Design a protein with these regions (language model features):
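Hydrophobic, membrane-inserted alpha-helices
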Residues: 8-15, 67-71, 113-117, 137-143, ...
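Alpha-helical transmembrane segments and their membrane-interface exit regions
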Residues: 32-40, 93, 138-143, 163-167, ...
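Short hydrophobic alpha-helical membrane-embedded segments
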Residues: 1-10, 60-65, 109-110, 132-136, ...
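Transmembrane alpha-helices
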Residues: 1-35, 132-139
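Cytoplasmic-side transmembrane-helix entry/capping segments in multi-pass membrane proteins
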Residues: 1-6, 101-108, 128-135, 153-164
């Protein structure tokens, strides 16, 4: 019942937002495409599970530093620290790794979760990375149809997932640029402790709903670059996104 009520609420909010400002559609589409890319990446990496993954896991997490590096690399590739945290907990439950290794992986995952934000901040707002998405999607979809070869098909899902991520970032960036011309979110900026609490709560809520701190962070950076939120409020949103991403691990 709670999930249905949440879904109806989200639809109502989106419907109202589209009615108030049609330019919001591009931002929402960017978030949707970005999340679709994450799902595609997840499906791609699932294709490589099994004995090979377990053997690889033992070799790459036998020390604390290796566990830390493993968490960083896997989160960078999969673009989901929540997913890595849940998978780590399942590895612990299955006895594949010990507690110290699990802690190292989760620490690394929280470091790796910043890579998406660095990508957008360093390149996404200056370089048209959406242009790289098109060939990735084309080659990825071709590989996805290789049903007789599990590895190639998994690689296709991963390549298509990266393409969707880049395309989603491009849509969000362009959407906020157009959105700023018709509606100014900065008028709702709040300073002081009240603003910190409010925007942290918004960051938590957005991450829980989308199940992705990456999506929340990238959305925040795109909004900040378009002048739609203040720097202080953007920091609060980033804090909220990192708090919200821990909820999945706790539930797991």
């Amino acid at each position: 019942m709670g999930r249905k009520a949440l879904l109806v609420t989200i639809f109502l909010i989106l419907g109202y937002g589209f009615w108030v400002s049609p330019d919001l559609k591009m931002v929402a589409a960017g978030v949707a495409i970005f999340l679709l890319g994450m799902l595609s990446l997840e499906d791609g990496f699932k294709s490589f599970t099994g004995g090979v993954l377990e053997a690889f896991l033992r070799k790459t997490t036998d020390t604390t530093w290796k566990s830390l590096g493993f968490g960083m690399v896997t989160t960078t590739l999969m673009q989901s620290s929540s997913l890595v945290s849940v998978v780590t907990i399942s590895f612990l439950s299955a006895g594949l790794i010990v507690l110290a290794q699990g802690i190292g992986i989760i620490f690394g995952a929280n470091l790796g979760t910043t890579t998406g934000a660095w990508l957008v901040a360093g390149l996404g707002l200056k370089v048209d990375i959406a242009a790289y998405a098109m060939p990735m999607l084309v080659f990825g979809v071709v590989l996805m149809f290789q049903k007789d070869h599990k590895g190639l098909r998994g690689g296709g899902y991963i390549l298509a997932g990266l393409g969707f991520l880049f395309l989603g970032i491009g849509f969000m960036k362009d959407g906020f640029a157009a959105f700023s011309g018709s509606f100014d979110l900065s008028q709702f900026a709040m300073g002081g402790f009240g603003g910190l609490v409010l925007y942290t709560a918004i960051g938590i809520a957005a991450t829980v709903v989308m199940q992705s701190s990456h999506a929340t962070l990238i959305l925040t950076i795109a909004a900040l670059a378009a002048g739609q939120v203040t720097y202080e409020n953007a920091l609060a949103l980033a804090i909220g996104s990192n708090v919200g991403t821990t909820i999945t691990a706790v539930l797991g």
